[in-house]
Amino acid sequence: MELVLNDDQKLLKESAEKLVERYGGPDAHRKLRDVESGFDKGRLKTIAEAGWLSLMVPEKADGLGLGITDLALALEQAGRGLVTEPVAALAASARAVGTGRAATGAGTEQALNSLVSGKNILIPVLQDPTVPAAKRERIFAEHYHYGYQLTGTRTGIPFAEVADGFLVDANTSDGTILIIVPRDTFGITVDASRTVDGTAHGTIDFAEVTLMADELLIAGVKQGEKLAADIYIRIMLGVSAEMLGVMEQALDLAVGYMQTREQFGRPIGSFQALQHRAVNDHIQIELVRSLLYQVCNAVDGGHGSRAMVAAVKARASEAVLSVTKSVIQMHGAIGFTDEYDAGLYLRRAMTLASQYGNASEHRESFVRHSRLDAEKAAEPGKRRK
């Protein structure tokens, strides 16, 4: 599909381009590789001040009330500039807290303000509820006095070590709840490790973590699963938008190099084999762009599906690795050096492609959700679409 931006979206995209040009880029990324958090907290504050974290917070909770399409426009630029802050995850958490406040008054205004200002890092710890039982990482929440006691483990959570709190979907005897778990709560253990691009992820273990529900419960059993699914799909689309930006900038690097690097007395960009490779990479990028924004618009319109989102993440994860590897090959030996920028985009691609599930896992997810959608449509009394 052709993406037609309205005036507000054009301004948002231009603003994001300027922010990333000023605060992002390969040089800024290199400086962060030795930082424990893997990102710049000062830059996160700047991003928050630009309104990215409050984009999807409902207007009833004093947010901007915009959609994932708008956030994707900003995150596409973030991908171009190797901005590693977990914007998609934090913006999704802010939406969850804001939605809870708007619907039931759950949470506190102070907690939401701390989140959208970038002061509080609330990392989602969510999982697709349709994952096969053998791969499922359940977190159980037992009723305990006036709250809950959480037990379970989740692996591969981005920025788990530096989080101030976690947004957890937990299973109770009555259904799924969505609850905030402060990082310093007794019983939480985080085992962190670094990824190839210098950021971090970790395994979180909840061992009889006791919580009072008054201020921490975002959604009870009636809305918990639905809200958790909404947040999960928005994170998938946000990360896919970052991958789109990574691909675009990586290919731009290669095209620029081919126009200046000469062999046999002529630019290597004049060689048909490299032209064909660049065109194939461009086609992959445009396929991801079209699918991404089509699904973003569908989600914002209230008729998106989990199968569609899985298709986006699978396509983007596969394409970003293919394009960035191709870019390395188009550069030749210089592409392998740490001093050259192309390798930074490959490393970023490797991290984003595996976040929240790789291409293979999301293809499986697409099949599961497509089957579930078909079964639901075939139920008696359901009109086939």
Name these PLM-found stretches:
Residues M1-L82, A103-T104, S114, G118, ...:
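Alpha-helical interface subdomain recognition
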Residues L66-G67, A133-R136, F159-A163:
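Short glycine/proline-enriched turns and hinge-like loops at secondary-structure junctions
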Residues V83-A106:
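N-terminal glycine-rich flavin-associated loop
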Residues A111-N113, D128-T130, R138-F140, R154-P158, ...:
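A generic local secondary-structure boundary/capping motif
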Residues S117-P129:
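A short, Trp-centered hydrophobic/proline-enriched beta-strand micro-motif
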Residues R136-I139, G156-I157, P182-G220:
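Flexible, small-/acidic-enriched active-site or ligand-binding loops
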